[in-house]
């Protein structure tokens, strides 16, 4: 299972609530990573992927059970079809030639020899859904971050992965990105995956928190249990809607946002869009019990302020429910103590202000400079312009 499914097969999975799985030779085995309807993914060598494809199921012992029968009804086992080292070496010798690589890669560096050198300025195409002029120096991203009166976009638990933050699986029609691509005239069979559209922010920003396995603690059933899915609750109205629709509401209001999370926020693949997506959504700060190292760096690079709760303090001890307004005050410096100011209404209708000490997770002076510039691209632009003036 990879990429788009046959619509009939996909509908069968939905109608029968099947526990569909994927077997792959890559390393992306997060829930829903290969496809939103693949509830689990198993990693295997390429020959094993072929063997499981022949069997059509994982509900058997591949070492002892048969994969199927031959034309005479005799059972066929894995050992019967498993290639020997000699067979593999012979195929590689026939199919892989050094000349293949020389023919492709050597001319790549002979610029202007075989064809006219291209202009260094890219001719942006407004209808492209694969590469588009990035918005990182204009609009909302050019405005100062106030870190004041922020609304929570999501309150999340532990072990939030970059795949929760910005999935890379196949785009389905009823997703926000799928609906956008359809409006752009792209047929469903050509939607491809989120990862292939990472050069187009209008497609990929709609993937922010689009993972169907997400648990946003702001979205609950009447019995108090958390609903699973790409959902958000817009405040102060308290209306629950699809995550992207909530982001659009807040973008139209120019409402600064914050994310509250548990331990190990941002683990998994070092995906740049996990940081880009939340910044484009208007998130100015993320307060968590802990950050994965690379993702924390990516947040700084996008101008999002990572803040860490002190030991013994978290979203549960503070009884956060998403109705609050958040502000951050203090001197931003490497690992300095800042104050998270939480304003909320009490049960008797009064306004309560809670001040919580948090650690600024800008860990070096250079990270402070990058953050203050608005991100690594903005810092690069500043240095470039200052260098030209000098």
Positions of predicted regions on the chain:
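Fe-S-dependent hydro-lyases/dehydratases of central metabolism
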Residues: 1-390
């Amino acid at each position: 299972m990879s990429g788009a499914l046959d619509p009939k097969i996909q509908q069968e999975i939905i109608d029968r609530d099947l526990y569909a799985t994927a077997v792959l030779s890559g390393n992306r085995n997060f829930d829903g990573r290969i496809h939103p309807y693949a509830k689990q993914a198993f990693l295997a060598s390429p020959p094993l992927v072929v063997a499981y494809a022949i069997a059509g199921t994982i509900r058997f012992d591949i070492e002892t059970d048969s994969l199927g029968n031959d034309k005479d009804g005799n059972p066929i086992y894995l050992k019967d079809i498993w290639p020997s080292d000699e067979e593999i070496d012979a195929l590689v010798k026939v199919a892989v030639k050094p000349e293949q690589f020389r023919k492709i890669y050597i001319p790549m560096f002979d610029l202007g020899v075989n064809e006219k050198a291209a202009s260094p300025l890219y001719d942006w195409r407004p209808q492209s859904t694969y590469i588009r002029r990035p918005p990182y120096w204009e609009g909302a991203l050019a405005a100062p971050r106030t870190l004041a009166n922020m609304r929570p976009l999501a309150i999340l638990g532990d072990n939030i992965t970059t795949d929760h933050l910005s999935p890379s699986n196949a785009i389905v029609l009823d997703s926000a990105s799928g609906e956008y691509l359809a409006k752009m005239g792209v047929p469903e069979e050509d939607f491809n995956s989120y990862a292939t559209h990472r050069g187009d922010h209008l497609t990929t920003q709609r993937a922010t928190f689009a993972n169907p396995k997400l648990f946003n603690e702001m979205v609950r059933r009447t019995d108090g249990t958390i609903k699973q899915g790409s959902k958000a609750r817009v405040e102060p109205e308290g209306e629950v809607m699809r995550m992207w629709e909530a982001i659009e509401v807040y973008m139209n209001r120019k409402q600064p946002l914050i994310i509250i999370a548990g331990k190990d926020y941002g683990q998994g693949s070092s995906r740049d869009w996990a940081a880009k997506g939340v910044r484009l959504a208007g998130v100015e700060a993320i307060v968590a019990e802990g950050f994965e190292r690379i993702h924390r760096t990516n947040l700084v690079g996008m101008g999002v302020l990572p803040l860490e709760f002190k030991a013994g303090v978290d979203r549960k001890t503070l009884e956060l429910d998403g109705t609050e307004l958040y502000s951050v005050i203090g001197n931003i410096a490497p690992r300095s103590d800042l104050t998270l100011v939480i304003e909320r209404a009490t049960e008797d209708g009064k306004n309560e202000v809670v001040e919580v000490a948090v650690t600024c997770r800008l860990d070096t002076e250079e990270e402070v400079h990058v953050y203050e510039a608005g991100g690594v691209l903005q810092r690069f632009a500043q240095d470039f312009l200052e260098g030209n003036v000098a």
